[in-house]
Amino acid sequence: MRGVLLASIAFGLVASSAAAQDRKGIRFWNLTLYTVTTLQMSPAGKDSWGPDQCKNDRDGTVDHDERLRITGVEPGRYDVKLSDKTGRVCIVRNVEVREGAVFSIEEKQLTDCRR
């Protein structure tokens, strides 16, 4: 009986952990050097940019090492267009986005940029 109770508790913890992960949704982690002021996503190769995801943040920007909740995006591969406080506009291509996970963009990925 005790074993059944322990197994039930363990199963409940695993299930609640998975549910909590799903509730977190998709998040972006800014690992670039500068504050991101706009962030838009398009299905990879389509140049069909969605809304500015930075509007999901209280101050409308994403500081270095800050995470941002992404809305209205299904898991898949996306091109990400971002601008930062220096005026740089960059496109990072073919970024994998998974449900309940964080995707990051690092400074070294910003190779397709203009001012």
Labelled PLM ranges:
Residues 3-14:
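Sec-dependent N-terminal signal peptides
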Residues 16-20:
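Sec/Tat signal peptide C-region and signal peptidase I cleavage site
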Residues 21, 83-114:
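Structured interaction patches on ligand/partner-binding surfaces of diverse proteins
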Residues 22-26, 66:
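Structural beta-strand segments of beta-rich domains
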Residues 27-34, 43:
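Asparagine-centered strand-capping/turn motif at beta-strand->loop junctions
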Residues 49-74:
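Intrinsically disordered, low-complexity Pro/Gly/Ser/Thr-rich segments with frequent PxxP/GP/PP motifs
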Residues 78-80:
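A short tyrosine-centered beta-strand micro-motif
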